[in-house]
Amino acid sequence: MDGRRDCRRSVLRRMLRRLPCALLALGLTATLGSAGVLATRRAQELTGRGAVEQPRLNAAYAQGSEGPAPEAETAHPARFATNLTYTSLDAPDDGSAVARVTWDDAWFSADEGDYNHELAQTSSVLAALAYSESGYYQARENHPPYMENALASLGFGEVSTESYRYRSKVVDEVLDLATGDADGAAYTIARKHLGSGHDDPARDLILVSARGSYGSEWLSNLDMSRDEAGDHGGYVRAAREIGAEVVSWAEESRALGAEVSVLLVGHSRGGAIANLVAAELDDLRAQAGDAAPFGPVYAYTFAAPATTLASDARSERYGNIFNIANPSDIMPYLPLSAWGYERYGVDLELPSAGCADFDRLEDEMRAVYRESVGVECSADAADVLIARTVCDNIAAAVGSAEELVTPVGALTTFRLLATHVDPVRILYSHYPSTYIAWMSVTDESQFVPVPN
């Protein structure tokens, strides 16, 4: 008996001695395996293989088919209302939500500097759809191409979501992190022919909807570097990529004899990117004059962080960019204005507690949310006090963006956020669905302009 026990102990000791080597071998295998997966994915990306193919526009989603037939609300034949389906993080079952929107081709011949609340409300849904599209490129058989379906119902004949192909799966996000490529962004670019060329001049609308923070892209929010114009380093690379694509599409339309209007939308990081694209196009148009390949630029952003240190960000040149923020949402306060950060264009705040008729508006917003998303809205208007207090405390403790990236600045900021902010609760005010519900029950007269 003792001999067998000694034998077992001897075997156990040998196993324990080998355990570190075994664990090391497993670690090396996992590391090499992961490296192999990333190398394979990188090769696929470079050769255009191994990704979900871009969907074609679905003919079943004819103009207005997601809801009742297009409504002849005015004499303009291109004006109608329809339902658009998008996804929300808190929606039950398949995660889908429905929003009623209006569309009017005449919007894109009007003055770009005049705020258009109907266009803004529709833009809030188009911004949310940028997130919804990701599911198609992750699991093609289980998720419809929400963006293509929505834009087909709005009459767009050409839609590209090509940029999602290698920016939607987990392996893509890990690869972007490994290659330092996390500053990019997935986006949709689309074209709709507006004018007939008879009574109205031929006009094309080019739409861009930029996706917000996704996977490793979230880290670019923390990139406090800036370019020569003072624009946020974590957003500017994606903005330049999209801006170049818009110019290319506009030149194609111009070559075919069409005037060109541009619509830019985005939520959160996508809103910041859309903000910079709009400013870039405004600058290009100011420099090129009539030689610019596009005319009016309409930009509507939602929950966008601040984007620039440029001293002229609020100048008249950028008066066509409208940035809509929920005052209970902490993201639009960052990076802090105390550090000199702004957004290009005009900032507008949704109603907050204490505003005239707020209780009625909030009740209406919650009713719309419940009907659209299928659950109660968990956003709390009282979070405006938390958001502003935390930001004031950070500004008092951390004097600049440069100080933020020091160990002391980073730890101080983290401590203040961890002490005062419930990350789950505060995000409810940031949800695209919360913005959509608010946009559905308000108009511009109830917004609070943010002073320059």
Question: Which role does the model predict for each range below?
Answer:
Residues 24-28, 32:
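Hydrophobic core
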Residues 358, 362-451:
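Long, charge-rich alpha-helical interaction segments
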